[in-house]
UniProtKB/Swiss-Prot annotation:
GO molecular function: acid phosphatase activity; lysophosphatidic acid phosphatase activity
Gene3D superfamilies linked to this entry: Phosphoglycerate mutase-like (3.40.50.1240)
Keywords: Hydrolase, Lipid metabolism, Mitochondrion, Phospholipid metabolism, Transit peptide
Subunit structure: Monomer.
Organism from which the protein derives: Bos taurus (Bovine)
Entry protein name: Lysophosphatidic acid phosphatase type 6
Tissue: Detected in brain (at protein level).
Amino acid sequence: MISRVFKLRMWAPVGVLTSLTYCLHQRRVALAEPGGADQQNPVDRNLLELKMVQVVFRHGARSPLKPLPQEDQQVEWKSQLLEVPPQTQLEYTVTNLAGGPKPHSPFDSQYHETTLKGGMFAGQLTKVGMEQMFALGERLRKNYVEDIPFLSPTFNPLEVFIRSTNIYRNLESTRCLLAGLFQRQKEGPIVIHTDEASSEVLYPNYQYCWNLQKRTRGRRQAASLQPGISEDLKKVKEGMGIASSDEVDFLVLLDNMAAEQVHSLPSCPTLKRFAWMIEQRAVDTALYILQWEDREGLQMAVGPFLHILESNLLKVVDPATPPSKTRKLYLYAAHDVTLMPLLMTLGIFDHKWPPFAVDLTMELYQHRESKEWFVQLYYRGKEQVPKGCPDGLCPLDKFLNTISVYTLSPEKYHMLCSEAQMMGLGNGE
């Protein structure tokens, strides 16, 4: 979870999206007519060819972002937890989206202002987290190198595009994933692309999207006052001896509890006793902030990122796209606060907090005979059925229709984000 995140370029023109979606729909209609391929029948997966894979993942296990208020309830976060496993070591370079110097990371500067009991900084990727990411990389290797000879066994920059939020734990998580995926073998330099904090879209940018900030302002605090959440929070805080005035909600409790559990550190008995309730109430709190019915809010939270994923799909489908403009694999290092709204918009959110090193994988296939396109989603390695799709193997036009409700082009995103600010200026504020 990015601290403060609940507070306060690549793109396809609309005409291109509309025409491609229409063509995909017309092709499906024609194939469903007498003499064509009957889409009511199951698709023969042996006739499907994998064309592209996109993976959105959360970083590995880390130290908490905000310690609990009482020192006797805090565990020790010692520097030994930061040991780098040898198998994860891999050199990489970080640039901005245009290939220039790495931008400044205000989040990392903020984390270094908080020293936890034991000496570690807040939000640091640990050895456990590195091993988790290496294991995820090995799973991807099994899927796309060994089981299906889709990717080269060594890293090839012509096959892989990598983007991460500009936060050190995510950059290092990406390193470990790549080490597992390619067994530390590479044919060219590994470049991880990042963006400025002011224009980052790999997480809901509450700080710089004014309209999103306005819509959600106060919701986190209000969530703790909701019936059920309020009573449960009081019960947990009293059990831990936390004063009612202390700014500790279920998001802070879950952040500490999850970090302690994954590192097998001795959590306080109250956290252990209420573990299930803490996770559920943290999810309830996040859903109160995001709100299913707030379509524009979800659009601003994850719409630009959906647009990037959509654009990658459309570039592969478009026969006019030069091979040099596409990659076989797109990797996006993100956060729990990215995955939650992403899963919501896809209709596959399981009401569980996205754990460390979790992945959402999107595969694009083409039928060898009918030339139709299909999307297959996996979350935590399990097949998913997106909203509006007949089954796990979803016709591309249906999938595009599902995400079109929330997708935002850069122009629309900036326009929607600035609405609250412009209205304020118009009112003389």
